[in-house]
UniProtKB/Swiss-Prot annotation:
Positions contributing to carbamoyl phosphate binding: 52-55, 79, 103, 130-133, 262-263, 290
PROSITE patterns tied to this protein: CARBAMOYLTRANSFERASE
One GO term of the biological process aspect: L-arginine biosynthetic process
Naturally occurring in which organism (per UniProt): Geobacter sulfurreducens (strain ATCC 51573 / DSM 12127 / PCA)
Function: Reversibly catalyzes the transfer of the carbamoyl group from carbamoyl phosphate (CP) to the N(epsilon) atom of ornithine (ORN) to produce L-citrulline.
Protein's recorded name: Ornithine carbamoyltransferase
Source lineage: Bacteria, Pseudomonadati, Thermodesulfobacteriota, Desulfuromonadia, Geobacterales
Family: Belongs to the aspartate/ornithine carbamoyltransferase superfamily. OTCase family.
């Protein structure tokens, strides 16, 4: 049976922990200059309907380091952008490639693609979930803290794809999560209900960023207006006043807390320059770890 990586809810705690372990092994080999061409001779299609810097570079480099050949495909220059049915593209790509990564808008697109694909499909981002990023974030936490158990995670800002995926991760892995989101910008209701039924840890939501951040071990945020929401920028700026991760807000967290941001950051909006450049910031290690965790995901699915 073909295994895909579309959302964290497809996986058990043990399976996700296994990916963290493999990621550590691959990162160590890369740092030591030890070849780890686990996908030698394979080809991986990288389909982008949403443009990206980190996703494209980390996947292309990761595919190459695993010994495979990356194929960048933009919807603007492919038949997908001209209305070819997803199921047709999926079946054809599977005849040429050994795996597919898709970065797109609707979660239903990656799910339909996977349904018709005979090779593994990886969700590089949708409007609902961003599983590769949360896995990179958690791998970074493990590196800094030695694990995630017993920690309090705080999310401040939009209840977007990042927040939705953090909620799934907390329910599966069993850590406490406190979210602070303005009214009208809460996480997806179905994701929330699923997590509340499953979670053995505390997953809470408030409108008060100070309440969410207080005594947190990990503090996380993201842009207020995601790609495709640019026309809502002014409205969102007004709604998110008081939700900026600044020195005063971060000071409410534990003294040894770490700050995460998936990037790109709008400094002075959701996070200040002093915080992202400060001693608590793990943002650059977090960005690097996209490479390592995605290699672990690809290797586990495609080798």
């Amino acid at each position: 049976m073909i295994r895909h990586f579309l959302a964290l809810n497809q996986f058990t705690k043990e399976e996700l922990d296994g990916l963290f372990t493999l990621s550590r092994e691959l990162k160590d080999k890369q740092k030591q200059g030890v070849p780890h061409r686990l996908l030698e001779g394979k080809s991986v299609a990288l389909i982008f309907e949403k443009s990206s810097t980190r996703t494209r570079v980390s996947f292309e480099v990761g595919v190459a380091q695993l010994g495979a050949h990356p194929l960048f495909i933009s919807s603007a220059t492919s038949q997908m952008g001209r209305g070819e049915p997803i199921k047709d593209t999926a079946r054809v790509m599977a005849r040429y490639c050994d795996g597919v990564m898709i970065r797109t808008y609707g979660q239903e697109i990656v799910e339909e693609f996977a349904r018709y694909s005979s090779v593994p499909v990886i969700n590089g981002l949708t409007d609902l979930f961003h599983p590769c990023q949360i896995m990179a974030d958690l791998f970074t936490v493990i590196e800094y803290k030695g694990g995630y158990q017993g920690l309090k995670f705080a999310w401040v800002g939009d209840g977007n794809n990042m927040a939705n995926t953090w909620i799934e991760a907390a329910a599966i892995l069993g850590f406490d999560l406190a979210l602070a989101c303005p009214t009208g910008y809460e996480p997806d209701r179905q994701v929330w209900d699923w997590a509340q039924q499953r979670a053995t840890s505390s997953i809470t939501i408030t409108e008060d960023p100070e309440e969410a951040v207080r005594d947190a071990d990990v503090v996380n945020t993201d842009v207020w207006a995601s790609m495709g929401q640019e026309q809502e920028q002014k409205e969102r700026e007004a709604a998110f006043q008081g939700y900026c991760l600044d020195d005063a807000l971060v000071a409410l967290a534990r003294p040894d807390c770490m700050v995460l941001h998936c990037l790109p950051a709008h400094r002075g909006e959701e996070i200040t320059d002093s915080v992202i450049e400060g001693p608590r910031s793990a943002v650059w290690d977090e960005a690097e770890n996209r490479l390592h965790i995605q290699k672990a995901i690809m290797a586990s699915l495609m080798k």
